[in-house]
């Protein structure tokens, strides 16, 4: 099975700028509640992926998002892991 290359921080930031709502501070939990421009919370995508083991393309299909949006959410998660992990623990347990 081929491994996919993890994007660089600059590549992550480019996707985040394009696909993640830049006004995350308007959400109740701030950066932990950031959403894609389609309105899907990043924490929900990450929690769903953990629970299902879905790969990027399966996750994109399940949420009717492009793979690039999922990549942006994963990049945002890498940059804000402690906030999003806390949000997941509060919500999912």
Segments from the language model and where they lie:
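Short alpha-helical "recognition helix" segments of helix-turn-helix
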Residues: 58-61
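Major-groove recognition helix of helix-turn-helix-like DNA-binding domains
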Residues: 68-79
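Short, Lys/Arg-enriched anionic-surface-contact patches
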Residues: 16-41
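Short, amphipathic alpha-helical "recognition" segments used to contact nucleic acids or chromatin
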Residues: 38-54
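Short Lys/Arg-enriched helix C-cap and helix-to-coil transition segments
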Residues: 83-93
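General nucleic-acid-binding
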Residues: 1-13
């Amino acid at each position: 099975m081929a491994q996919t290359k993890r994007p660089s921080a600059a590549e992550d930031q480019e996707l985040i700028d394009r696909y993640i709502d830049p006004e995350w501070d308007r959400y109740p939990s701030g950066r932990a509640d950031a959403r894609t421009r389609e309105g899907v919370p990043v924490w929900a995508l990450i929690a769903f992926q953990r629970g299902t083991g879905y790969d990027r393309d399966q996750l994109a299909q399940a949420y009717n998002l492009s793979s690039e949006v999922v990549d942006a959410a994963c990049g945002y998660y890498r940059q804000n892991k402690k906030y999003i992990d806390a949000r997941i623990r509060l919500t999912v347990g």
